[in-house]
Swiss-Prot record:
Belongs to the PaaX family. Pfam families: PaaX, PaaX_C, PaaX_M. GO terms for molecular function: transcription cis-regulatory region binding. GO terms for biological process: DNA-templated transcription; negative regulation of DNA-templated transcription initiation; phenylacetate catabolic process. InterPro entries: PaaX-like_central, PaaX-like_N, PaaX_C, PaaX_trns_reg, WH-like_DNA-bd_sf. It comes from the Bacteria. Pathway: Aromatic compound metabolism; phenylacetate degradation. Negative regulator of the paaZ and paaABCDEFGHIJK catabolic operons. Binds the consensus sequence 5'-WWTRTGATTCGYGWT-3'. Binding of PaaX is specifically inhibited by phenylacetyl-coenzyme A (PA-CoA). Keywords: DNA-binding, Repressor, Transcription, Transcription regulation. NCBIfam families: PaaX_trns_reg (TIGR02277). This is Transcriptional repressor PaaX.
Amino acid sequence: MSKLDTFIQHAVNAVPVSGTSLISSLYGDSLSHRGGEIWLGSLAALLEGLGFGERFVRTALFRLNKEGWLDVSRIGRRSFYSLSDKGLRLTRRAESKIYRAEQPAWDGKWLLLLSEGLDKSTLADVKKQLIWQGFGALAPSLMASPSQKLADVQTLLHEAGVADNVICFEAQIPLALSRAALRARVEECWHLTEQNAMYETFIQSFRPLVPLLKEAADELTPERAFHIQLLLIHFYRRVVLKDPLLPEELLPAHWAGHTARQLCINIYQRVAPAALAFVSEKGETSVGELPAPGSLYFQRFGGLNIEQEALCQFIR
């Protein structure tokens, strides 16, 4: 067995893999910029080499369709699954965090949200969405973020139907005498110790792959490249989507997120061309071949280090 196959199987078996989560990763990474639609049989072919059968795929697709994340259309005996409006919106929101090349710049301002008159259930749901967007809870009804744009937050509040129950404030960076207390509060409210530990686990899992990709370069087939890329993004996504992506000024020393991001970028850059080739080979839509990736694909991680024209030629 190839050393790359050994690594891939170890990654699959290390922790239980949710079908809905894995296929969400696949759609977001491999299909969202290629039309967002694929035949069920193509998905089964893409995942077969990882040990996931058609029943695994069908069950996950059924659940994602039931949740409104995927739409399904049937032509004859074939079923084609595509990202719904909801699925595409959530995918775009997630990829803005997943494929960042660096921490967000900060102008020293804070966005504060004070909720008024919300029942406990609604408040809990809104707080969950805001935390996913990078907010922290300074108090039961007070959320804060140093890096969110007001327009994005307003959209979220309107979608949740609570815009009239939330007061928005802007605050400047605190005086120097309160910065030590601020750092301690930030670490507590944003659970940075736990987040750092998750990044460390990701690094321990994927760092051994870096020398393997050099030692076994001739074994990096399109199928193996795709499997590596899917697992890489799947496990990185599970960590980075919980990261509030705080500005550099607020992070503790030796923040593992920096190393984890660069590790992900280095591996992704290495396997992306061949992975795209495999998706092109196996992927089929209701109108034939998958389209070439859109321009936004090539802006991932600050820009993939391969010319778009050359990559499109490679996958044909």
